């Protein structure tokens, strides 16, 4: 009887765990769909969605970007080596360690994607006197980047299909998603424009320059 009762409790707990996980999963995709349709729409409540959604979107973007970049480099080097073997092009004496390259791109993109909201948060705190809770604000901020995540997913699928033949298309989609991140950053400066001590255009320029310095510094350090 004790064993049967214990087994029934485990089954019940497992069902509750699955139901809870499914509910969280469903809420995330509800958030994702709403932000895709209306990226800048205000929430009905300030903390309507989980404070972890922003981090989840950054992780998704980081992993997909690292994969796309590493796989493109791997495919292009392989294609060059193939042409070098059948032509007078010089052969490569060595090839990169792609696992280590992927890890470095993970670090690079993690800081890159977190840099945009962090710089925006700092500027809004200092110049616009906004007192946000960072984790919840990050969810709202990254919600405006859902379309960029979709474009990045498209680039990832294209990379799976044919990174060489679809190279130009992949680059176009990939850089389009980066442009959307820049648009989101600029938009975040204008949302509190009436409370700013500095014109939001100049705030945006300051923030983008800071982000550019961070990006170039990371590239020099990691690569």
Task: Describe the predicted segments one by one.
Residues 127-210:
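Hydrophobic alpha-helical transmembrane segments and adjacent short intramembrane/lumenal linkers
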Residues 68-85, 222-223:
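Membrane-helix interface motif
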Residues 61-65, 69, 112, 116, ...:
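Alpha-helical transmembrane segments of multipass membrane proteins
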Residues 89-154:
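Alpha-helical transmembrane segments with an aromatic anchor "belt"
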Residues 1-63:
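N-terminal juxtamembrane cytosolic/stromal segments of multi-pass membrane proteins
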